[in-house]
Amino acid sequence: MDYRNILLIKMSSLGDILHTLPLAAALRQRYPKAKITWLVHPQFAGFVPDPPVIDEVLYFD
């Protein structure tokens, strides 16, 4: 199955965000053409991988 859009929702809790990093890389490898977006609290945005792993970061306050 080819996915065009994937949304990761890990808004806060640093440990949860760090544990999701390998998943983000695996999703990029498995679905190279998908747009991957991560929803996160602004204070944790620095931990979200840059492109090409994550295409867009959305902030939830």
Predicted regions and their residues:
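Catalytic machinery of carbohydrate-active enzymes
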Residues: 1-61
